[in-house]
From Swiss-Prot:
Contains 3 disulfide bonds. This is Teretoxin Tan6.1. It is found in: Secreted. It comes from Terebra anilis. One of its GO terms (cellular component) is extracellular region. The cysteine framework is VI/VII (C-C-CC-C-C). Expressed by the venom duct. Keywords: Cleavage on pair of basic residues, Disulfide bond, Secreted, Signal, Toxin.
Amino acid sequence: MATSGRLLCLCLVLGLVFESLGHPGARLPKDGKRAVSTRHAHDDPFAHEVNCGGFPCMFSCCENDVCMELNCEYFPSLGQ
């Protein structure tokens, strides 16, 4: 019984620690700016992003407006 109580306390403490490390939920900070820049994919020469029906597909191909990661008939080269 004592072991299960200790395990429960450990889980609660770890939950509080991990919650305090970042923003809880998917909301923006109060200044309206994102905490992490989304331009890192555009700066990486090896990143591959395809516009697929208005949604970006990273490291995959777009067939019939659906992101496919397997069974791609055509996969554009990274140099384009």
